From Swiss-Prot:
GO terms for biological process: L-leucine biosynthetic process. The keyword Nucleus does not apply. GO terms for cellular component: cytoplasm. Catalyzes the condensation of the acetyl group of acetyl-CoA with 3-methyl-2-oxobutanoate (2-ketoisovalerate) to form 3-carboxy-3-hydroxy-4-methylpentanoate (2-isopropylmalate). Its EC number is 2.3.3.13. Its cofactor is Mg(2+). Mg(2+) binds at residues 48, 252, 254, 288. This is 2-isopropylmalate synthase. It is found in: Cytoplasm. Residues 445-572 are annotated as: Regulatory domain. One of its GO terms (molecular function) is magnesium ion binding. It is an enzyme of class 2 (transferase).
Length: 572
């Protein structure tokens, strides 16, 4: 690092020559505003997020992502850059021709400001009921000088010509209700007077009305300043955009400085109507703004975001599958450890908070900004597993002594069982004690189902299973068909559970090696999720054992919940 970084770096100053002193608004009003309703959300997971992956999503993952975004409640979804590849073009066509787009959802497609690309983009959405077509060109001074070797007039003309071509192309497809969107790329580093000049020139071409609005999107393509500077930029544009009542003012913050969430929130306070981003902050470089954090920040303040994250673990597993990227264990609201306390004083305060928290009262549990149950999660306390414990921790002991490597979320779940035992004994547990507790919790559970045997067979191109279990002392043969042994076994048991995750590992090496399978299932009746574990020399058998284990533990959880419910009812 340089001793004098000012010789190489300068703070961005988009207000130079626009306001007196050139250092932001002196009459800003956004600090006095609060967010009382959610903005329009637009997911770009399938476009900006997808293009930033090591390996872009295949068609199966794209469709799975799209359907999940719809289930969450997204009404605007950017699905592709159709002129960039045949794969993207074909995906848009599949969405339209396959009837996958609900009536209340609008897809969005992106194009650069070039006639042949615009034409290809409009062709991709032919037959759609509604579509947002989004065009952009970079307008910042370093792009004008270094990338395009042109001046302000040249950049502005590109935008205006593209806007005119949009009108012409839309007229050729009268069956589609089009919304036009324009982004002055790298707005965050552009002189404000020029940014508004270009945006207003585009608006003049499109002639939007309050009934047929256009979208002007102001991206922090590269985050260059503190969030308050971005908010000042948005408020200035909010004041100076032409036909403001006919324009949806949109923002697209990136996270280069780590403050995209704050920038988006302040931008909404400053007048933005709409926010573009990705689930869990995927996207180029450091990512786009995280729509989940934004939405749940609103929720924690008593404002419903209009998006449903009541099964956030399932959303997280789907995103990890589709993107092949892990979610950080400390990620707000969704990370495996965010509802976990290692500190004894934190654990004590949280337990006391839960003890006095009334079901219909304002949430006041210390250290927890929202009720984990609202997100389909639970408070999970890991005890004696950090550096302050004086021991290696539960997971370390099981791995070191028994070769068992547990998924992080299973570590969290199993720690609750260890907590109960240590509370009862009042002493520390040995590795043997922990292993016996693990066997009892996951491997020896046999009610309502006890596994007996299974047989696999091909069934019309799918996997069929004949599964023998013992239930209440009676043997039953259950049959199911699925995409593989796990899917087939779930269908055979017909328990209404949803598969959230599956992992398999080896215990030991050589001829004595065994397989361990971990299955995470969500209760279809809304009771959260739980793990099952199976260990066997055969990996398929281990997997079936894990499914039976998980279903047995879900059933026991339901029984405990019903018992608590009866006790509460009896005291009323």
């Amino acid at each position: 690092m340089l001793k004098n970084p000012h010789t190489k770096y300068r703070p961005a100053n988009p207000f130079a020559g626009v306001v007196p002193g050139g250092r932001g608004l002196s009459d800003r009003t956004w600090p006095d505003n609060t967010i009382t309703r959610p903005p329009v959300w637009m997911s770009t997971d399938l476009r900006d997020g997808n293009q930033a992956l090591f390996e872009p999503m295949n068609s199966e993952r794209k469709m799975r992502m799209f359907k999940m975004l719809v289930e969450i409640g997204l009404k605007e979804i950017e699905v592709a850059f159709p002129a960039a590849s045949q794969t993207d073009f074909d995906f848009v066509r599949e969405l339209i021709e396959g009837g996958h787009i609900p009536d209340d959802v609008t897809i969005e497609v992106l194009t650069q400001a070039r006639p042949h690309l615009i034409e290809r983009t409009f062709e991709s959405v032919r037959g759609a009921k509604r579509a947002i077509v989004h065009v952009y060109n970079a307008v910042a001074p370093n792009f004008r000088r270094i990338v395009f070797d042109t001046d302000r007039a040249g950049v502005k003309q590109i935008a205006v010509d593209s806007a005119r071509y949009f009108v012409e192309m839309a007229a050729r497809q009268p069956g589609t209700d089009f919304t036009f969107q324009y982004s002055p790329e790298v707005f965050s580093g552009t002189e404000l007077d020029f940014a508004v000049e270009v945006a207003n020139a585009v608006i003049e071409v499109w002639q939007p009305t309050p009934q047929q609005k256009c979208i002007i999107n102001l991206p922090a393509t590269v985050e260059m300043s503190t969030p308050n500077v971005y908010a000042d930029q948005i408020e200035w544009m909010h004041r100076h955009l032409a036909r403001r009542d006919s324009v949806l003012l949109s923002v697209h913050p990136h996270n280069d400085r780590g403050t995209a969430v704050a920038a988006a929130e302040l931008a909404v306070m400053a007048g933005a109507d709409r926010v573009e981003g990705c689930l869990f902050g995927n996207g180029e470089r450091t990512g786009n703004v995280d729509l989940v954090t934004l939405a749940l920040n609103l929720y924690s303040q008593g404002v419903h975001p209009g998006l449903d994250f009541s099964r956030i673990n399932e959303v997280a597993r789907t995103v990890e599958h589709c993107t092949q990227l892990p979610i950080h264990p400390r990620h707000p609201y969704v990370g495996d450890l965010v509802f976990t306390a290692f500190s004894g004083s934190h654990q004590d305060a949280i337990k006391k908070g839960f003890a006095v928290q009334q079901p219909d009262a304002v949430w006041e549990v210390p250290y927890l900004p929202v009720d984990p149950a609202d997100l389909g999660r639970s408070y999970e306390s890991i005890i004696r597993v950090n550096s302050q414990s004086g021991k290696g921790g539960i997971a370390y002991l099981l791995e070191a002594e028994y070769g068992l490597v547990m998924p992080r979320r299973l570590q969290v779940e199993f720690s609750a069982a260890i907590q109960r035992i240590t509370d009862e004994r009042g002493t520390e547990l040995s590795a043997g004690d922990i292993w016996r507790a693990f066997e009892e919790e996951y491997l020896a559970v046999a009610a309502p189902y006890a596994y007996v045997e299974h047989h696999l067979a091909e069934h019309g191109g799918q996997q069929g299973i004949s599964l023998t279990v013992e239930e209440a002392g009676v043997r039953r043969v259950l049959r199911g068909v699925g995409n593989g042994p796990i899917d087939a076994a779930l269908h055979a048991l017909d328990a209404g559970a949803v598969l959230l995750g599956y992992e398999e590992r080896a215990i030991g090496q050589g001829g004595d090696a065994r397989a361990v399978a971990y299955i995470e299932l969500a209760d279809g009746e809304g009771g959260g999720s739980t793990f099952g574990v199976g260990i066997h020399a055969n990996i398929v058998t281990a997997s079936v054992l894990a499914i039976v284990s998980a279903l047995d533990r879900l059933a026991q959880r339901r029984e405990r919940a019903d018992g608590v419910g009866r006790q509460v009812a009896a005291t009323r």
